[in-house]
Amino acid sequence: MKFLDEAKVYIKSGDGGAGAVSFRREKFIEFGGPDGGDGGRGGDVWVEVVNGLNTLIDFRFQQHFKASIGQHGMGKTRTGAKGSDVVLKVPVGTQIFEEDNETLIMDLTKEGQRFRLAAGGNGGFGNAYFKSSTNQAPTHANPGLAGEEKTIWLRLKLIADAGLVGLPNAGKSTFLATVTRARPKIANYPFTTLHPNLGVATIDGREFVLADIPGLIEGAHEGVGIGDRFLGHVERTRVLLHLVSAQEEKVGKAYKTVKAELDAYGGGLTDKPEIVALSQIDVLDEKELKKKAKELEKACGRPPLLLSAAAHIGMTEALRALRDIIVSASNGGDTALPDRSMPHESEVEEEDDRL
């Protein structure tokens, strides 16, 4: 499945149906009076979080969504039917922004969550509504009100427990493929990973989700390489596993390069718990390994984990370290997802403005 994490979408709710101008006509009733019914309300545009999706690719092929208009009113004071709704189905972790792509409307973090993006227009009143003591036979009715139309942005931030970060070819995809059933592309050239990958790791009966994102290089926050656009996918994680390849000539500099890019991006990434690991250690002899481990320890301020996904060295220790932080964060609630289930202004009932 192809990956898309941002989409621009045009939506329009249905117009309200027009009220009817009608008079009661029955045998032996000369002046039956008005009986025009009200128009039906236009259909709404909703967004719904569904299970089984991890991309916005469907919105590459359809960007326009329009709900149906309400049915017009009819005689015998029959109200028109409401227009059919349109539902945009999105993955967990989707954020909705205004057209400026900056103003957040809603952050959808739970399966089954629904939110009304655009309310249908009210139906117009039929002429029966306007009957009064001074106007026994009104000959006018209201048209239906127009529905709402707007352009919005959908932005996906994958929800994972732990995120893998590092320079290109640091062994992130190999680590993910080794500890989960994910099958990311793995090759010996930079930027093999072009989009985020998710996998479920299990250790001592505990499962958690890992996210692998494309590698960062110096200047990524300014668009160098693939840039830092995928860092949003690790914003929601509880812990980062920072892999530094043992094949780097200067592992300390490699570590600081990625840390600088995380700091430049912001989003609280540098405040997250971080586990540092020297990866691909199977390519070094013992003397070189000690030297680089010491250099990396000096850069990050603590002894790094030593691991090799290819040789299955240190994998269990890394998974247990991740699990411990995830469990601790879950119990403490410090990194829980924000509760944005409060109604937006579009969910609040508006005053009847058909008059």
UniProtKB/Swiss-Prot annotation:
Position of the signal peptide: none
Major place of residence: cytoplasm
Obg domain ranges (all copies): 1-159
Annotated binding of GTP, by residue: 166-173, 191-195, 212-215, 279-282, 308-310
Xref: InterPro entries: G_OBG, GTP-bd, GTP-bd_Obg/CgtA, GTP1-OBG_CS, GTP1_OBG_dom, GTP1_OBG_dom_sf, OBG_GTPase, P-loop_NTPase
Pfam family, one: MMR_HSR1
The EC number(s) this enzyme carries: 3.6.5.-
Region span, Disordered: 333-355
Cell compartments where the protein resides: Cytoplasm
Keyword presence, GTP-binding: yes
A molecular function (GO) term: GTP binding
Keyword annotations from UniProtKB, A to Z: Cytoplasm, GTP-binding, Hydrolase, Magnesium, Metal-binding, Nucleotide-binding
Gene Ontology biological-process entries: ribosome biogenesis
Highest taxon listed in the record's lineage: Bacteria
Ligand binding (Mg(2+)): 173, 193
GO cellular component, as recorded: cytoplasm
Domain OBG-type G span(s) in chain numbering: 160-327
S-S bridge residues: none
Named cofactor requirement(s): Mg(2+)
Database matches in PANTHER family: DEVELOPMENTALLY REGULATED GTP-BINDING PROTEIN-RELATED, MITOCHONDRIAL RIBOSOME-ASSOCIATED GTPASE 2
SUBUNIT field: Monomer.
Described purpose of this protein according to its UniProt entry: An essential GTPase which binds GTP, GDP and possibly (p)ppGpp with moderate affinity, with high nucleotide exchange rates and a fairly low GTP hydrolysis rate. Plays a role in control of the cell cycle, stress response, ribosome biogenesis and in those bacteria that undergo differentiation, in morphogenesis control.
Protein's name according to its UniProt entry: GTPase Obg
Organism: Agrobacterium fabrum (strain C58 / ATCC 33970)
